[in-house]
Amino acid sequence: MNKLNWRRIVLKVGSALIAPDQDGCRSRYILTIAQFIVRCRARGIEVILVSSGSVAAGAHLFPSDTARSVVMKKAMAAAGQTEMIAMWDRFFDFPSAQLLLTHGDLRDHERYQSIRETVFTLLEHGVLPIINENDAVTTDDLKVGDNDNLSAMVAAAADADALLIFSDVDGLYDKNPNLHDDAILLPEIKSIDDSIYAMAGCATSAVGTGGMKTKIEAAEKATSHGISTYIINGFKEETFTRLLAGENPGTIFLPYEKPMQDSVHWMTHTANEQGEVVVDGSFDKSLEGETGCIRGDEIMAVHGEFAIGDTILVRSEDGTRLAKATANYSSCLLSFIADNEQSEFSEKMQDSIGPVISEKHIALLEKS
Protein backbone atom coordinates (compact mmCIF):
# COMPACT_ATOMS: atom_id res chain seq x y z
CA MET A 1 0.00 0.00 0.00
CA ASN A 2 1.69 3.18 -1.19
CA LYS A 3 -0.91 5.65 -0.04
CA LEU A 4 -3.98 5.79 2.15
CA ASN A 5 -6.82 6.02 -0.35
CA TRP A 6 -9.60 4.27 1.51
CA ARG A 7 -13.15 5.51 1.23
CA ARG A 8 -14.69 3.00 3.65
CA ILE A 9 -13.08 0.40 5.90
CA VAL A 10 -14.15 -2.37 8.26
CA LEU A 11 -12.13 -2.99 11.42
CA LYS A 12 -12.36 -6.34 13.18
CA VAL A 13 -11.26 -6.28 16.81
CA GLY A 14 -10.87 -9.60 18.63
CA SER A 15 -11.77 -10.61 22.17
CA ALA A 16 -8.13 -10.68 23.27
CA LEU A 17 -7.93 -6.92 22.66
CA ILE A 18 -11.24 -6.19 24.39
CA ALA A 19 -10.68 -8.34 27.49
CA PRO A 20 -7.03 -9.47 27.50
CA ASP A 21 -7.28 -11.07 30.95
CA GLN A 22 -10.79 -12.49 30.35
CA ASP A 23 -12.06 -10.40 33.28
CA GLY A 24 -14.15 -7.63 31.77
CA CYS A 25 -13.36 -4.84 29.32
CA ARG A 26 -9.99 -3.12 29.53
CA SER A 27 -9.02 0.11 27.78
CA ARG A 28 -5.31 -0.74 27.54
CA TYR A 29 -5.40 -1.63 23.83
CA ILE A 30 -8.82 -0.32 22.88
CA LEU A 31 -7.85 3.31 23.44
CA THR A 32 -5.26 3.12 20.65
CA ILE A 33 -7.78 1.55 18.28
CA ALA A 34 -10.35 4.22 19.17
CA GLN A 35 -7.80 6.92 18.40
CA PHE A 36 -7.15 5.26 15.04
CA ILE A 37 -10.88 5.32 14.28
CA VAL A 38 -11.06 9.02 15.16
CA ARG A 39 -8.10 9.82 12.92
CA CYS A 40 -9.54 7.84 10.02
CA ARG A 41 -12.84 9.68 10.29
CA ALA A 42 -10.95 12.99 10.43
CA ARG A 43 -9.48 12.07 7.04
CA GLY A 44 -12.93 11.44 5.61
CA ILE A 45 -12.70 7.64 5.85
CA GLU A 46 -15.94 5.92 6.84
CA VAL A 47 -15.39 3.27 9.51
CA ILE A 48 -17.42 0.20 10.46
CA LEU A 49 -16.35 -1.65 13.60
CA VAL A 50 -16.86 -5.38 14.10
CA SER A 51 -16.13 -5.97 17.77
CA SER A 52 -15.88 -9.35 19.44
CA GLY A 53 -15.64 -9.73 23.19
CA SER A 54 -19.14 -9.84 24.65
CA VAL A 55 -18.62 -13.19 26.40
CA ALA A 56 -15.18 -12.22 27.70
CA ALA A 57 -16.52 -8.82 28.77
CA GLY A 58 -19.43 -10.33 30.66
CA ALA A 59 -17.62 -13.22 32.34
CA HIS A 60 -16.58 -11.18 35.39
CA LEU A 61 -20.21 -10.41 36.18
CA PHE A 62 -20.76 -14.05 37.16
CA PRO A 63 -19.07 -16.18 39.85
CA SER A 64 -15.56 -17.16 38.81
CA ASP A 65 -16.27 -20.86 39.27
CA THR A 66 -19.30 -20.78 36.96
CA ALA A 67 -19.15 -23.56 34.37
CA ARG A 68 -19.22 -22.11 30.86
CA SER A 69 -22.11 -24.06 29.43
CA VAL A 70 -23.73 -22.96 26.19
CA VAL A 71 -26.56 -21.28 28.09
CA MET A 72 -24.14 -19.55 30.46
CA LYS A 73 -22.09 -18.21 27.54
CA LYS A 74 -25.27 -16.75 26.09
CA ALA A 75 -25.98 -15.05 29.41
CA MET A 76 -22.41 -13.73 29.58
CA ALA A 77 -22.74 -12.43 26.03
CA ALA A 78 -25.98 -10.62 26.85
CA ALA A 79 -24.49 -8.98 29.95
CA GLY A 80 -21.12 -8.29 28.37
CA GLN A 81 -22.51 -6.72 25.19
CA THR A 82 -23.86 -3.67 27.02
CA GLU A 83 -20.57 -3.26 28.89
CA MET A 84 -18.56 -3.54 25.70
CA ILE A 85 -20.69 -1.02 23.79
CA ALA A 86 -20.51 1.41 26.72
CA MET A 87 -16.73 1.10 26.72
CA TRP A 88 -16.45 1.91 23.01
CA ASP A 89 -18.96 4.74 23.25
CA ARG A 90 -17.10 6.61 25.97
CA PHE A 91 -14.05 7.01 23.71
CA PHE A 92 -15.94 8.92 21.01
CA ASP A 93 -17.52 12.36 20.76
CA PHE A 94 -19.70 11.17 17.86
CA PRO A 95 -22.64 8.75 18.03
CA SER A 96 -22.34 5.01 17.62
CA ALA A 97 -24.94 2.34 16.90
CA GLN A 98 -25.15 -1.32 17.84
CA LEU A 99 -26.07 -4.00 15.29
CA LEU A 100 -26.29 -7.61 16.48
CA LEU A 101 -26.45 -10.10 13.62
CA THR A 102 -26.87 -13.81 13.02
CA HIS A 103 -26.01 -15.82 9.94
CA GLY A 104 -29.74 -16.05 9.35
CA ASP A 105 -29.86 -12.27 8.92
CA LEU A 106 -27.08 -12.37 6.34
CA ARG A 107 -28.13 -15.41 4.34
CA ASP A 108 -31.70 -14.14 3.90
CA HIS A 109 -31.45 -11.78 0.94
CA GLU A 110 -34.21 -9.43 2.06
CA ARG A 111 -32.66 -9.02 5.52
CA TYR A 112 -29.20 -8.76 3.95
CA GLN A 113 -30.39 -5.80 1.89
CA SER A 114 -31.97 -4.30 5.00
CA ILE A 115 -28.63 -4.53 6.82
CA ARG A 116 -26.92 -2.77 3.91
CA GLU A 117 -29.47 0.04 3.95
CA THR A 118 -29.14 0.50 7.72
CA VAL A 119 -25.34 0.60 7.61
CA PHE A 120 -25.30 3.05 4.71
CA THR A 121 -27.80 5.32 6.48
CA LEU A 122 -25.74 5.30 9.69
CA LEU A 123 -22.57 6.18 7.78
CA GLU A 124 -24.37 8.93 5.87
CA HIS A 125 -25.28 10.56 9.19
CA GLY A 126 -21.85 10.20 10.77
CA VAL A 127 -22.78 7.35 13.10
CA LEU A 128 -20.22 4.61 13.81
CA PRO A 129 -21.79 1.15 13.29
CA ILE A 130 -20.53 -1.34 15.90
CA ILE A 131 -21.39 -4.89 14.86
CA ASN A 132 -21.17 -8.20 16.66
CA GLU A 133 -22.71 -11.64 16.27
CA ASN A 134 -25.80 -11.99 18.44
CA ASP A 135 -24.34 -14.70 20.67
CA ALA A 136 -27.10 -14.29 23.27
CA VAL A 137 -29.79 -15.75 21.02
CA THR A 138 -28.10 -17.47 18.09
CA THR A 139 -28.27 -21.22 17.60
CA ASP A 140 -25.82 -23.51 15.82
CA ASP A 141 -27.69 -23.38 12.51
CA LEU A 142 -27.74 -19.56 12.60
CA LYS A 143 -24.16 -18.95 13.76
CA VAL A 144 -21.45 -17.48 11.60
CA GLY A 145 -19.18 -18.91 14.29
CA ASP A 146 -16.43 -16.32 14.35
CA ASN A 147 -16.18 -12.59 13.80
CA ASP A 148 -13.38 -12.91 11.25
CA ASN A 149 -15.82 -14.35 8.72
CA LEU A 150 -18.58 -12.05 9.96
CA SER A 151 -16.36 -9.03 9.32
CA ALA A 152 -15.73 -10.19 5.75
CA MET A 153 -19.46 -10.59 5.13
CA VAL A 154 -20.04 -7.11 6.57
CA ALA A 155 -17.23 -5.66 4.44
CA ALA A 156 -18.81 -7.13 1.31
CA ALA A 157 -22.28 -5.93 2.28
CA ALA A 158 -20.92 -2.43 2.95
CA ASP A 159 -18.85 -2.25 -0.26
CA ALA A 160 -15.75 -1.51 1.81
CA ASP A 161 -12.35 -0.80 0.29
CA ALA A 162 -10.38 -2.55 3.02
CA LEU A 163 -10.85 -5.03 5.85
CA LEU A 164 -8.42 -4.70 8.76
CA ILE A 165 -8.30 -7.72 11.07
CA PHE A 166 -6.49 -6.85 14.29
CA SER A 167 -4.88 -9.91 15.83
CA ASP A 168 -2.29 -10.87 18.44
CA VAL A 169 0.30 -11.69 15.75
CA ASP A 170 2.05 -9.48 13.21
CA GLY A 171 0.46 -11.23 10.23
CA LEU A 172 0.71 -14.51 8.34
CA TYR A 173 3.99 -16.40 8.68
CA ASP A 174 5.26 -19.20 6.48
CA LYS A 175 5.17 -21.40 9.60
CA ASN A 176 4.18 -21.08 13.24
CA PRO A 177 6.43 -18.37 14.77
CA ASN A 178 5.79 -19.77 18.25
CA LEU A 179 7.43 -23.05 17.24
CA HIS A 180 9.97 -21.93 14.65
CA ASP A 181 12.50 -19.16 15.24
CA ASP A 182 13.15 -18.91 11.51
CA ALA A 183 9.50 -18.24 10.62
CA ILE A 184 9.18 -15.47 8.04
CA LEU A 185 6.40 -12.86 8.00
CA LEU A 186 4.72 -12.74 4.59
CA PRO A 187 3.96 -9.10 3.75
CA GLU A 188 1.84 -9.79 0.65
CA ILE A 189 -0.41 -12.61 -0.52
CA LYS A 190 -1.55 -12.41 -4.14
CA SER A 191 -3.87 -15.42 -4.12
CA ILE A 192 -5.21 -17.87 -1.56
CA ASP A 193 -4.82 -21.61 -2.12
CA ASP A 194 -4.25 -24.74 -0.05
CA SER A 195 -0.62 -23.82 0.59
CA ILE A 196 -1.73 -20.60 2.29
CA TYR A 197 -4.19 -22.46 4.50
CA ALA A 198 -1.45 -24.95 5.39
CA MET A 199 0.59 -22.10 6.86
CA ALA A 200 -2.26 -21.24 9.24
CA GLY A 201 -1.90 -24.33 11.39
CA CYS A 202 -4.60 -24.82 14.02
CA ALA A 203 -3.80 -22.09 16.57
CA THR A 204 -6.72 -20.28 18.20
CA SER A 205 -7.05 -17.49 20.71
CA ALA A 206 -7.52 -18.43 24.35
CA VAL A 207 -10.19 -15.75 24.61
CA GLY A 208 -12.03 -15.82 21.29
CA THR A 209 -13.28 -18.39 18.78
CA GLY A 210 -11.09 -17.57 15.81
CA GLY A 211 -7.60 -18.46 14.67
CA MET A 212 -5.41 -17.84 11.64
CA LYS A 213 -7.49 -20.22 9.51
CA THR A 214 -10.66 -18.16 10.01
CA LYS A 215 -8.72 -15.01 9.18
CA ILE A 216 -7.62 -16.52 5.87
CA GLU A 217 -11.22 -17.60 5.22
CA ALA A 218 -12.26 -14.00 5.85
CA ALA A 219 -9.55 -12.75 3.50
CA GLU A 220 -10.77 -15.13 0.80
CA LYS A 221 -14.33 -13.84 1.14
CA ALA A 222 -13.27 -10.19 1.15
CA THR A 223 -10.66 -10.25 -1.62
CA SER A 224 -13.09 -12.00 -3.99
CA HIS A 225 -15.29 -8.91 -3.57
CA GLY A 226 -12.38 -6.60 -4.42
CA ILE A 227 -11.56 -5.73 -0.81
CA SER A 228 -7.93 -5.48 0.35
CA THR A 229 -7.55 -7.45 3.57
CA TYR A 230 -4.94 -6.99 6.28
CA ILE A 231 -3.96 -9.21 9.19
CA ILE A 232 -2.08 -7.00 11.61
CA ASN A 233 -1.04 -6.83 15.26
CA GLY A 234 -3.52 -4.80 17.29
CA PHE A 235 -1.38 -4.92 20.43
CA LYS A 236 1.36 -2.69 18.97
CA GLU A 237 0.84 1.08 18.85
CA GLU A 238 3.20 1.37 15.88
CA THR A 239 0.71 -0.66 13.82
CA PHE A 240 -1.72 2.23 13.70
CA THR A 241 0.94 4.87 13.08
CA ARG A 242 2.23 2.89 10.12
CA LEU A 243 -1.25 2.35 8.71
CA LEU A 244 -1.97 6.08 8.81
CA ALA A 245 1.37 6.68 7.08
CA GLY A 246 0.26 4.43 4.22
CA GLU A 247 2.50 1.52 5.18
CA ASN A 248 1.72 -2.17 5.54
CA PRO A 249 2.59 -3.28 9.09
CA GLY A 250 1.51 -6.89 8.64
CA THR A 251 0.17 -9.08 5.84
CA ILE A 252 -1.99 -7.76 3.02
CA PHE A 253 -4.12 -10.06 0.89
CA LEU A 254 -4.54 -8.42 -2.50
CA PRO A 255 -8.05 -8.15 -3.95
CA TYR A 256 -9.20 -9.95 -7.09
CA GLU A 257 -8.51 -8.02 -10.27
CA LYS A 258 -12.02 -8.99 -11.42
CA PRO A 259 -14.18 -9.09 -8.28
CA MET A 260 -17.38 -11.12 -8.12
CA GLN A 261 -20.64 -9.30 -8.70
CA ASP A 262 -22.60 -8.58 -5.52
CA SER A 263 -25.27 -11.22 -6.12
CA VAL A 264 -22.74 -13.89 -7.09
CA HIS A 265 -20.55 -13.10 -4.07
CA TRP A 266 -23.53 -13.26 -1.72
CA MET A 267 -24.58 -16.65 -3.09
CA THR A 268 -21.03 -18.03 -2.97
CA HIS A 269 -19.87 -16.81 0.42
CA THR A 270 -22.92 -15.94 2.51
CA ALA A 271 -26.11 -17.69 1.44
CA ASN A 272 -26.88 -21.23 2.61
CA GLU A 273 -28.48 -23.56 0.10
CA GLN A 274 -32.04 -24.59 0.97
CA GLY A 275 -32.07 -27.62 -1.33
CA GLU A 276 -30.29 -29.05 -4.33
CA VAL A 277 -30.76 -30.14 -7.91
CA VAL A 278 -28.77 -32.85 -9.66
CA VAL A 279 -27.91 -32.08 -13.30
CA ASP A 280 -26.66 -34.24 -16.14
CA GLY A 281 -23.36 -33.95 -17.98
CA SER A 282 -24.57 -31.15 -20.26
CA PHE A 283 -24.33 -28.57 -17.44
CA ASP A 284 -21.05 -26.96 -18.57
CA LYS A 285 -22.13 -26.86 -22.21
CA SER A 286 -25.43 -25.25 -21.27
CA LEU A 287 -23.65 -22.38 -19.54
CA GLU A 288 -21.33 -21.91 -22.52
CA GLY A 289 -24.23 -21.79 -24.98
CA GLU A 290 -26.02 -18.74 -26.32
CA THR A 291 -28.78 -18.86 -23.71
CA GLY A 292 -26.51 -19.56 -20.72
CA CYS A 293 -29.30 -21.30 -18.80
CA ILE A 294 -30.36 -24.67 -17.41
CA ARG A 295 -33.67 -26.17 -18.54
CA GLY A 296 -35.81 -28.92 -17.08
CA ASP A 297 -34.55 -31.72 -19.33
CA GLU A 298 -31.10 -31.35 -17.73
CA ILE A 299 -32.41 -31.88 -14.18
CA MET A 300 -31.97 -35.47 -12.98
CA ALA A 301 -33.28 -35.09 -9.42
CA VAL A 302 -34.49 -32.54 -6.87
CA HIS A 303 -33.70 -32.80 -3.14
CA GLY A 304 -35.06 -30.78 -0.23
CA GLU A 305 -37.82 -28.19 -0.07
CA PHE A 306 -37.27 -24.66 -1.36
CA ALA A 307 -39.26 -21.73 -2.66
CA ILE A 308 -38.81 -19.39 -5.58
CA GLY A 309 -35.87 -17.08 -4.85
CA ASP A 310 -34.14 -19.48 -2.43
CA THR A 311 -30.50 -20.37 -2.96
CA ILE A 312 -29.97 -23.95 -4.09
CA LEU A 313 -26.96 -26.16 -4.74
CA VAL A 314 -26.34 -27.52 -8.23
CA ARG A 315 -24.38 -30.77 -8.25
CA SER A 316 -23.48 -33.53 -10.67
CA GLU A 317 -24.59 -37.15 -10.43
CA ASP A 318 -21.26 -38.08 -8.84
CA GLY A 319 -21.79 -35.52 -6.05
CA THR A 320 -19.49 -32.76 -7.33
CA ARG A 321 -20.63 -29.32 -6.14
CA LEU A 322 -20.92 -27.32 -9.35
CA ALA A 323 -22.66 -24.08 -8.44
CA LYS A 324 -25.04 -22.18 -6.22
CA ALA A 325 -28.04 -20.61 -7.88
CA THR A 326 -31.28 -18.75 -7.26
CA ALA A 327 -34.28 -21.00 -7.78
CA ASN A 328 -36.69 -19.78 -10.45
CA TYR A 329 -39.14 -22.50 -9.41
CA SER A 330 -40.22 -24.09 -6.14
CA SER A 331 -38.93 -27.58 -5.37
CA CYS A 332 -42.42 -29.00 -5.90
CA LEU A 333 -42.81 -27.47 -9.35
CA LEU A 334 -39.23 -28.25 -10.30
CA SER A 335 -39.74 -31.92 -9.40
CA PHE A 336 -42.75 -31.98 -11.73
CA ILE A 337 -40.68 -30.42 -14.52
CA ALA A 338 -37.84 -32.91 -13.99
CA ASP A 339 -40.27 -35.85 -14.09
CA ASN A 340 -42.14 -34.53 -17.13
CA GLU A 341 -39.47 -32.69 -19.06
CA GLN A 342 -40.81 -33.77 -22.45
CA SER A 343 -44.41 -32.76 -21.76
CA GLU A 344 -45.93 -29.88 -23.69
CA PHE A 345 -47.11 -28.26 -20.43
CA SER A 346 -43.57 -28.35 -18.99
CA GLU A 347 -42.11 -26.77 -22.11
CA LYS A 348 -44.75 -24.04 -22.24
CA MET A 349 -44.26 -23.26 -18.56
CA GLN A 350 -40.52 -22.78 -19.03
CA ASP A 351 -41.10 -20.68 -22.14
CA SER A 352 -43.46 -18.47 -20.11
CA ILE A 353 -41.71 -18.27 -16.72
CA GLY A 354 -38.14 -18.82 -17.82
CA PRO A 355 -35.48 -21.50 -17.42
CA VAL A 356 -34.92 -23.51 -14.26
CA ILE A 357 -31.70 -21.59 -13.66
CA SER A 358 -30.60 -18.49 -15.55
CA GLU A 359 -27.01 -17.38 -16.08
CA LYS A 360 -27.33 -14.14 -14.12
CA HIS A 361 -28.51 -16.05 -11.04
CA ILE A 362 -25.77 -18.65 -10.82
CA ALA A 363 -22.42 -18.70 -9.02
CA LEU A 364 -20.00 -21.36 -10.24
CA LEU A 365 -17.98 -23.14 -7.57
CA GLU A 366 -14.34 -24.07 -8.00
CA LYS A 367 -13.92 -27.74 -8.76
CA SER A 368 -11.51 -29.46 -6.41
Swiss-Prot record:
Domain of life of the native organism: Bacteria
Subcellular location: Cytoplasm
Annotated binding of ATP, by residue: 12, 167-168, 209-215
UniProt domain PUA: residue ranges: 274-348
Enzyme Commission number(s) of this protein: 2.7.2.11
Pathway of action: Amino-acid biosynthesis; L-proline biosynthesis; L-glutamate 5-semialdehyde from L-glutamate: step 1/2
Keyword Amino-acid biosynthesis listed: yes
Reaction it catalyzes: L-glutamate + ATP = L-glutamyl 5-phosphate + ADP
One Gene Ontology cellular component: cytosol
GO function terms (MF aspect): ATP binding; glutamate 5-kinase activity; RNA binding
Residues binding substrate: 52, 135, 147
Keywords from the named record: Amino-acid biosynthesis, ATP-binding, Cytoplasm, Kinase, Nucleotide-binding, Proline biosynthesis, Transferase
Gene3D superfamilies tied to this protein: Acetylglutamate kinase-like (3.40.1160.10), PUA domain (2.30.130.10)
Disulfide bonds: none
Enzyme class: transferase
Pfam families membership: AA_kinase (PF00696)
CDD domains to which the protein is assigned, alphabetical: AAK_G5K_ProB, PUA_G5K
GO-annotated biological processes: L-proline biosynthetic process
InterPro entries reported in the protein's UniProt record: AceGlu_kinase-like_sf, Asp/Glu/Uridylate_kinase, G5K_ProB, Glu/AcGlu_kinase, Glu_5kinase, Glu_5kinase/COase_Synthase, Glutamate_5-kinase_CS, PUA-like_sf
Parts forming coiled coils: none
Family statement: Belongs to the glutamate 5-kinase family.
Function as written in the Swiss-Prot or TrEMBL entry: Catalyzes the transfer of a phosphate group to glutamate to form L-glutamate 5-phosphate.
Protein name: Glutamate 5-kinase 1
Native source organism of the sequence: Pseudoalteromonas translucida (strain TAC 125)
